Amino acid sequence: MKGLLSLSVLPVLAYASPMIVDSIHQDAAPILSSTNAKDIPDSYIVVFKKGVSSSSALAHQTWVQEIHTSTESKRLKKRNQFTFKNEAFDGLKHTFDIAGGLLGYSGHFDEEVIEQVRRHPDVEYIERDSEVRALESVTENGAPWGLARISHRKRLNFGTFNKYIYAAQGGEGVDAYVIDTGTNIEHVDFEGRASWGKTIPENDDDIDGNGHGTHCSGTIAGKKYGVAKKAHVHAVKVLRTSGSGTMSDVVKGVQWAAESHLKQVGETKKGNRKGFKGSVANMSLGGGKSVTLDRVVDQAVAVGMHFAVAAGNDNADACNYSPAASQNSITVGASTLTDERAYFSNYGKCTDIFAPGLNIQSTWIGSKYAVNTISGTSMASPHICGLLAYFLSLQPASDSAFAVAEITPAEMKENMISIASKNALTDIPADTPNLLAWNGGGSDNYKEIVGGKDNATKEHISSTLTEKLEQLAEEGLTAIYNELKDVVVA
């Protein structure tokens, strides 16, 4: 029965909108459900209040497993007596500790157990576990124009549509965690710079059987298809071959990535890893609104990870989806070759920036040479993740003689937004930032890029000369044009 909420619950619901509280009792933690996701029956994510220690959390988790075992034993006896009592519950599934900033667990419990859990004084709220999916994509014929677009201020033309201008060291020293369906780590485009990190779904294989994660990885760090061509990809599999999974598995995957990042930071401080420049992560997935997933992503950002997430493909307000609504990640909408908002792209104040997302060619599964061309904000977000890795690689390494204060995710997000091409897109709603990602036009000087010296002079000269060469081609001087065009535009 729904009723009035205590004041202590109000901050959670303000953060949670659009979520519903489907079960309210006095002195009990609320149970939250998303308004636009499919719940997984009898599956829950339990989040502890701030201030609960790791030892207290462990004691609670031991307690909940004990009462689960007890109720299951009683259930088994009833099932032996009454054949219609055939439900079985699995108990504790995952435990969560995101660098001490968010503690909790997930599991499959009956109503008797969950009622005891929600009355425990350490519990802040309970969220129904729900389905998460790789954002739907459309397979079409096309060309990899996205890299070219983020390296030019002006709309692409005949001379620039396939010219990616970039710093050669882009991505070097940066780890990229692709939290998705996995990655075809044997693909030649990764040049050995991809490794399997972790498989979260129980009893699943360490392969990408879907292709979605491999495509995202290629856009981030592939030799031919990638923004940051020297970054190292870590596959974090949270979705099964079908492209779907559970919210609790995704949360656990984010935790694993954050822990791996912190381990690399520690190894660098010990002198065991040279040239480390930081970690980025991409999540081209989504489901309904989840307070927990948004908070977990924000906590991973708080420990130093740079996160890009897809806005979603429902042509709707991105604030109604997770992780698109997370506050500290960079939420990415999709643009087209003609500089329009892609017809499917979500929008709204939770969208931070746009990047190419229609007809994007990248790596695929099936062989180490496979490629595919698909569309979606899933394809836009990896452009930003790659750009985060690209910009991080332009910083001095923390173990070098030229080391400077580490650039924080908040600073990087602010800088990326500040240098983006403004008002470049059409069909952008009034409450949505009209910003298109830009990589600095080939400059390898990050300070120069963010300082406003946006390499405009170089690009202006290149663009002007390209136009002149195109005129030569039109006048029949094709041989001269073919000889000079690559030199001028590169």
Swiss-Prot record:
Protein name, entry field: Subtilisin-like protease 8
Annotated compartments: Secreted
Coiled-coil segments on the chain, per record: none
Domain Inhibitor I9: 43-133
Keyword Membrane among UniProt keywords: no
GO BP annotations, alphabetical order: pexophagy; protein catabolic process in the vacuole; proteolysis; sporulation resulting in formation of a cellular spore
Domain Peptidase S8: 144-450
Enzyme active site: D180 (charge relay system), H212 (charge relay system), S378 (charge relay system)
Gene3D superfamilies from the UniProt entry: Peptidase S8 propeptide/proteinase inhibitor I9 (3.30.70.80), Peptidase S8/S53 domain (3.40.50.200)
Gene that this polypeptide is encoded by: SUB8
Propeptide: 27-134
Group of enzyme by EC: hydrolase
UniProt signal peptide: 1-26
Record carries keyword Metal-binding: no
Family stated for the protein in its record: Belongs to the peptidase S8 family.
